[in-house]
Amino acid sequence: MTEFDPEKFEDKYKHYFPQLQRAYKAAFETMNDQYDSELAHAIDQQVLSESEPFYEGDGEFRIELPENPRERLSGVLVNQERFETVLERYVEELESELQAVFGFQ
């Protein structure tokens, strides 16, 4: 567990890059085990790779997604409802992993 400093999180890629990688990897592994691996991989590589984590305070994180995440997805057939459901669950998992990595859980 890493000691968390909200001010350092403003420059997260300088101060917390390994921890961010660990959280994203753990979230991917969970999603890959629970959902279609092609869809999980596509969301990871084509949507979440362009996402931005933010610390909201009180141990809470928020993931800002790129614009039009569904339009970024290619190479996998999925309807809009399924995509939104899996993406929402993936974001929840990622936020939870960030909380765990930084000792809020």
Question: Which residues does each predicted region cover?
Answer:
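Acidic, polar-rich N-terminal leader regions of halophilic archaeal proteins
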Residues: 1-105
